[in-house]
């Protein structure tokens, strides 16, 4: 909750709140934390983790979420995307994708916190998700996540060029240039990071000034 307030004051454009083990542990997201975070952060808030039915989405939106992110449940039941988008609008539904490069080329989609390879092709799943009503894609590269050597520009660009909705690059940021590259070379509409900001390695204000100078 304190971090939500920190990011709000630091100039973040949006805050993504993930309960990363909710799907694996088969439980619902921590709604009490969300309620307090929404009170302190006056920027768009996306919430994800363990969201598997319409009632959960409704409750999260009422508690202050602006958008919900779905991953594993969408793969298990693609109609969940369609139903959610019809009920709440595509602008509320973010399709989260954890992808990893495949031997021989291309990328596979993983679920359950990156523990299970679905065998789905990343580009095909992104296109289907958008066709079913997802209004945004949050793309995390498992190859790059936590490494700090930059976002996965190849898969980011491939998916951004494939779909007609905003794509958010996630996983791999280590310096300011990586954000620039995600937006230019990778064709992403936005870039997400956690560790860099959590531990004060980069300041959001400095990053935004840098990106403005870079055009």
Residue ranges and their predicted role:
Residues 81-88, 180-215:
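C-terminal helical cap(s) of enzyme catalytic domains, especially alpha/beta-barrels
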Residues 61, 65-139, 143-144:
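Conserved anion-binding
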Residues 15-17, 45-49, 68-70, 93-97, ...:
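Hydrophobic faces of well-ordered beta-strands that scaffold small-molecule active sites
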Residues 41-67, 154-191:
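Catalytic cores of alpha/beta
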């Amino acid at each position: 909750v304190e971090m939500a307030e920190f990011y709000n004051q630091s100039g973040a454009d949006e805050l993504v709140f993930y309960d990363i083990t909710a799907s694996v542990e088969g439980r619902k997201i921590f709604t009490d934390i969300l309620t307090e975070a929404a009170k302190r952060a006056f920027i768009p808030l996306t919430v994800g983790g363990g969201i598997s039915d319409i009632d959960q989405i409704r409750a999260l939106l009422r508690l202050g979420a602006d958008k919900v992110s779905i991953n594993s449940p969408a793969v298990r039941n693609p109609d969940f995307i369609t139903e959610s988008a019809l009920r709440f609008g595509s602008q509320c539904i973010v399709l989260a994708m954890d992808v990893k490069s495949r031997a021989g080329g291309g990328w596979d989609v993983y679920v359950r916190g990156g523990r299970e390879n679905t065998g789905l092709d990343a580009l095909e799943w992104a296109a289907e998700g958008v066709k079913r009503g997802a209004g945004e894609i949050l793309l995390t590269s498992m190859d790059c996540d936590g490494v700090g050597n930059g976002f996965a520009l190849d898969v980011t660009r491939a998916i951004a060029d494939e779909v007609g909705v905003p794509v958010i690059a996630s996983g791999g940021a280590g310096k300011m240039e990586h954000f620039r590259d995600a937006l230019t070379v990778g064709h992403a509409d936005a870039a997400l990071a956690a560790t860099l900001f959590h531990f004060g390695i980069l300041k959001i204000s400095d990053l935004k000034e840098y990106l403005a100078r870079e055009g």
